[in-house]
Amino acid sequence: MNRTEAREWVVKMLYQYDVSRLPISKILENFYKEKDPGEQKEYIENTVIGAIEHLEEIDKEIERYSQNWALNRMPKIDLAILRCSIYEMQYGNIPVNISINEAVEIAKKYSTEDSPAFINGLLGAFVRDEGLEEGESNDN
């Protein structure tokens, strides 16, 4: 499994958590029955668990940049994509350009026609306001 596939799995797990509120350990267990994450296991677990631990903070950032979109009106898959990407940039030491590009590609694959532009715009505004540059990450 490569990092792109692992990131898709993270988004799927965050989506599953949002719609089911199953314990994250159960969600991880169910996904691992499907496919062995191999070298990406640490990234997957750190990102899923970290995004859930920081869910309130991440959701405040999403609300701040969503231009009058309430979280409960957004497609759940878009929320999962945004949560993954913001977590990566804020806490996961992932370069901004990689995280945004991957988020947009995942949106093209799994979400609505308008979602890639929405996600790109929201994440771009987040990066500008956080003072992150292309290729950088926040080293929290």
From Swiss-Prot:
Record's GO cellular component terms: cytosol
A single GO molecular function term of this UniProt record: RNA binding
RNA-binding among keywords: yes
UniProt keyword Cell membrane, yes or no: no
Keyword vocabulary terms for this entry: RNA-binding, Transcription, Transcription antitermination, Transcription regulation
GO annotation (BP), single: transcription antitermination
UniProt-listed InterPro entries: NusB-like_sf (IPR035926), NusB_fam (IPR011605), NusB_RsmB_TIM44 (IPR006027)
Function in brief: Involved in transcription antitermination. Required for transcription of ribosomal RNA (rRNA) genes. Binds specifically to the boxA antiterminator sequence of the ribosomal RNA (rrn) operons.
Similarity remark: Belongs to the NusB family.
Descriptive protein name: Transcription antitermination protein NusB
